[in-house]
Amino acid sequence: LTGDPEVPLGEGSFVDAYDADGAASSLQTKADHFKFRQMAFGEIYGSQGNIGFAPQLNKIDMFIKQVLSGFDSKYLPQKCGMDNENVLAVDLRGNVITCQNVSSKEVSKNGESHLGGTIEHIEAVELKSSTHWSNRPNCSTCPVLQLCKGACMFLDGDLWNVTCENAYSDNVALFALAFERLTGYIPTVIKGEGLPLHRQDIFGTVYTHVEDTNKKVFPIKVVSEKIAKIDDVEVYGQSKVQV
């Protein structure tokens, strides 16, 4: 971005697809995913890690340490850290909510409210708006779990599927970089029962891949609807797509 690898950059990964706008900004085809993985791996490997995205390099180091120490995934926290029983998200009105990225007025993607209660009645607080990675069907056997950490807990349905695909491509490049540092070899295929072929083939160079034919590209307009007004401040809901 700057041409100077000494300039630190705070983020270096995909934003989760929280809404239709995020999904539209995600990788859309298998070819897109393979191209991204090749680029991400190549830029870090080719520069010997001389990039400004320190968080990405730290993830590689962390993964290597976990492999060498035999770290058990049962101790792995969610990416956001909101599964920690000592962490609570509270808005300025004392409402206990899923996390800092949501409003107490919103409904989670699983149909449950993001409002879990109030700090005045802390004993009664109960959040049903999120799903821990250990309760999702494929996370526990995913090769990049230690890097991905389950992505976003409150996503579900199609938005979760898009986010999961993004997170896999984002992290499998780091997985390959860590593997190369550990062994001196660049992996090209990950064999795993139940792992889709486009995930087994890290860079898309080994197998033949057919794109999904049910995907159609439409011109879209992303809009946000005003859902409330609090103390003269307008509150907007999740973005929606108009075709």
Language model feature labels by segment:
Residues L1-D16, A20:
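Radical SAM/AdoMet-radical enzyme domain recognition
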Residues L9, C99, A151:
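Short acidic/histidine-rich active-site segments
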Residues D21-K35:
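Short, surface-exposed amphipathic charged segments that create phosphate/polyanion-binding patches used
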Residues D32-F71, N101-K149:
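C-terminal accessory region of radical SAM enzymes
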Residues C80-N84:
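Short, small/polar residue-rich loop motifs at catalytic or cofactor-binding pockets
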Residues R93, V107, S134-V243:
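Radical SAM enzyme core and accessory elements
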